[in-house]
């Protein structure tokens, strides 16, 4: 009886049951979204996914978020500024100068609450990221190292395949969309004779006492190289810094990834001839040899080849050169490699076709302007590793830049997979000027990701209203309708922030006389960051975007307007900023965008066949300012309106209101009375 009852368990149904219950053979959990890495970019995407109520998981190899910052930068000082005071209460404006905070709805999760230092300690960033994940309840699986990623084709999947992730324990995870936010983690190494003698930035001592009285050679010329030099500048005999390219100063290139002033002490001692120095040479043209005393000698590689040795500096006479004053003829005690970082491609199967970009060697994966891999649909690169889109152009490789590009990617996917159109505000055309003025004066995404993210204004039929879309990737402009779910049938404006085209570069003198302009007619020659408005009658095509003029962020527009640069980055001057902008918009739309008092609208209604939009959308709908005696008098005195009251009544009213302060018969508004449509002041 017992045997007969147990027998079915060993038959085909029982076998299937056993297979289904076996953990190693069970179907892996399937999620809509997977995020690799719980650094700033990964947590930022997790926040947006959670707010949208999406199914997601974050995989982090370390026990806490932000593991990169537990070790780097090696000398513990961040170069992202923590400007706690701006004199403004506007939270969006303040993010322009907060380079460390992630975006969230919780004001407690601003980095200003975690450090008072202008250049914070990396430990504060670790603490901040931990609180960000914990406070918001982000779904992070810690101590989970994804060791392999491959594809599994499936017609039912969103993108025609699922991403299969295998962790260090052999557990398998499936997801429809994969976000890679692992940063750049592989030290860049150049192979040349003697390269094995170089200590890496990732492992070299950070104790200055270890360098006392030594001659040091640093390979590289980025912030990590100068950071290393700054730490030991006061204890070494001298420091020589060698790189194939000239030094790039961030204040000259306007790129925050170039050398920052906080690390440039070596430039002082070099130019003031205090033993330290900079040298330019391709590392592959040199060789480093070690002598019997443990000293390192640098020589041109072809001399080494002629001597037919690569073992010891004692076997040939060093240094060798055509001249006897070879710059690096003194031996070095230490050689330190600070050549930057590359993306780790090792965990990705070839089926993903996650190739490196040709222009960047192995540094970055090849992605589109939408941050999606060119090889696999549904695979997105976030954070520092996505910097190929705007390398040395904008801030996309840093927190204060990629927090906005991550949001843009999330918005693209909300429409692609959940039919949620790109967020937009629809307003009457009378609000067009004020909407642009507000955004260029406070928007942080436009300000930080200049030339990459831009606001797009989609005009409605007959230009009676518009939709305002914020921070759209401008290189995807031709696909705007497909990517956002919005229509651009009646023309559009694009608001971008730009530096002058000839103002940025490692060889530029950015402190020359007359480096800025202040007159409206010279706005197109503005050098410093300023708003530029592009008008298109039709949405540009992909071909127009691809073959746009050199160094232009967008195709040639129907019309273009530069708002003149401002020393205070405050574009609210009525005559210098707002009036030229409004006139430009009016010319593009062939309409009047001024605001009018009710009396003017009443006059227009009696004398014109077509009213200005402000009167159509306001006055005729019983909207606008309610007239009072004091307001009426102010308008007349300001010559915004003609005083149509009978002369006797006007004089009588004037006498009653002014008493002995004004002679009887003196006109209320000095000078010729002007119609409202001709008033210069009403132009404001």
From Swiss-Prot:
Keyword Signal: yes
Modification after translation: N-glycosylated.
A Gene Ontology term for the protein's cellular component: endoplasmic reticulum lumen
Location relative to the cell: Endoplasmic reticulum lumen
Sequence segments annotated as region (Disordered): 649-684
Composition-biased stretches (Low complexity): 663-674
Keywords of this entry: Endoplasmic reticulum, FAD, Flavoprotein, Glycoprotein, Oxidoreductase, Signal
Motif Prevents secretion from ER, residue numbers: 681-684
Biological process annotations from GO: ERAD pathway
Gene3D superfamilies: FAD/NAD(P)-binding domain
Essential cofactor(s): FAD
Endpoints of the signal sequence: 1-26
Primary residence: endoplasmic reticulum
Sites carrying sugar chains: 143
The keyword Transport is assigned to this record: no
Listed Pfam families: Pyr_redox_3
Family classification: Belongs to the FOXRED2 family.
Subunit structure: Interacts with SEL1L. May interact with OS9 and DNAJC10. Interacts with TXNDC16.
Function: Probable flavoprotein which may function in endoplasmic reticulum associated degradation (ERAD). May bind non-native proteins in the endoplasmic reticulum and target them to the ubiquitination machinery for subsequent degradation.
Stated name of the protein: FAD-dependent oxidoreductase domain-containing protein 2
Annotated source species: Homo sapiens
């Amino acid at each position: 009886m017992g045997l007969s009852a147990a027998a079915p368990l060993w038959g085909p149904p029982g076998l299937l049951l056993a297979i289904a219950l076996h953990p190693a053979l069970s179907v892996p959990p399937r999620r809509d979204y997977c995020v690799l890495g719980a650094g700033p970019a990964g947590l930022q995407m997790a926040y947006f996914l959670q707010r949208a109520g999406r199914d997601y998981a974050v995989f982090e190899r370390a026990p806490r978020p932000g593991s990169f910052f537990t070790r780097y930068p090696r000398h513990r000082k961040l170069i992202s500024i923590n400007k706690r005071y701006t004199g403004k209460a506007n939270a969006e404006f303040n993010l322009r100068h907060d380079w460390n905070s992630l975006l969230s709805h919780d004001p407690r999760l601003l980095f200003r609450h975690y450090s008072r230092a202008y250049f914070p300690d990396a430990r504060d960033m670790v603490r901040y990221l931990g609180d960000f994940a914990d406070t918001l309840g982000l779904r992070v699986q810690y101590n989970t190292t994804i060791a392999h990623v491959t594809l599994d084709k499936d017609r039912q999947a969103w993108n025609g395949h699922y991403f299969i992730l295998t962790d260090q324990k052999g557990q398998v995870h499936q997801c429809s969309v994969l976000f890679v936010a692992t940063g750049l983690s592989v030290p860049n190494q150049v192979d040349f004779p003697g390269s094995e003698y170089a200590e890496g930035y990732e492992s070299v001592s950070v104790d200055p006492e270890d360098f006392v009285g030594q001659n040091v050679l640093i390979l590289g010329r980025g912030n990590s190289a100068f950071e290393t030099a700054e730490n030991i500048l006061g204890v070494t005999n001298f420091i020589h810094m060698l790189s194939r390219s000239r030094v790039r100063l961030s204040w000259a290139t306007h790129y925050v990834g170039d050398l920052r002033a906080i690390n440039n002490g070596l430039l002082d001692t070099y130019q003031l001839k205090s033993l330290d120095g900079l040298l330019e040479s391709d590392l592959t043209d040199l060789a480093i040899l070690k002598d019997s005393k443990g000293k390192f000698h640098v020589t041109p590689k072809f001399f080494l080849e002629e001597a037919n040795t690569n073992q010891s500096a004692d076997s040939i006479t060093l240094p060798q050169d055509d001249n006897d004053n070879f710059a690096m003829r003194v031996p070095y005690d230490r050689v330190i490699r600070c050549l930057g970082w590359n993306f780790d491609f090792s965990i990705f199967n070839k089926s993903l076709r996650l190739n490196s970009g040709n222009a960047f060697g192995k540094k970055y994966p090849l992605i589109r302007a939408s941050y999606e891999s060119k090889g696999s649909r549904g695979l997105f690169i976030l954070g520092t590793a996505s910097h190929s889109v705007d390398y040395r152009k904008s801030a996309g490789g840093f927190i204060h830049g990629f927090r906005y590009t991550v949001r843009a990617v999330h918005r693209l996917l909300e429409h692609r997979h959940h039919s949620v159109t790109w967020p937009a505000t629809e307003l009457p055309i009378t609000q067009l000027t004020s909407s642009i003025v507000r955004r260029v004066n406070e928007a942080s995404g436009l300000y930080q990701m200049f030339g990459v993210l831009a606001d797009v204004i989609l005009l409605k039929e007959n230009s009676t209203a518009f939709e305002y879309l914020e921070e759209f990737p401008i290189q995807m402009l031709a696909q705007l309708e497909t990517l956002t779910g919005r229509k651009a049938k009646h023309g559009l404006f694009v608001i971008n922030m730009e530096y002058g085209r000839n103002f940025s570069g490692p060889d530029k003198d950015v402190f020359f006389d007359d480096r800025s302009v202040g007159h409206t007619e010279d706005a197109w020659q503005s050098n410093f960051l300023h708003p530029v408005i592009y008008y298109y009658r039709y949405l540009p095509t992909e071909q127009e975007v691809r073959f746009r003029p050199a160094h232009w962020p967008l195709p040639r527009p129907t019309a273009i307007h530069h708002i003149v640069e401002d020393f205070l980055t405050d574009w609210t001057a009525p005559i210098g900023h707002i009036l030229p902008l409004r006139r430009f918009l009016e010319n593009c739309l062939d309409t009047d965008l001024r605001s009018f008092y009710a009396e003017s609208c009443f006059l227009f209604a009696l004398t014109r066949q077509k009213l200005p939009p402000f009167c159509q959308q306001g006055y005729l709908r019983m909207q606008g300012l309610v007239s009072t005696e004091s307001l009426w008098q102010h308008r007349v005195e300001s010559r915004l309106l003609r005083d149509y009251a009978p002369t006797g009544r006007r004089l009588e009213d004037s006498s009653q209101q002014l008493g002995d302060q004004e002679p009887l018969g003196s006109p209320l508004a000095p000078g010729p009375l002007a119609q409202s449509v001709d008033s210069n002041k009403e132009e404001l």
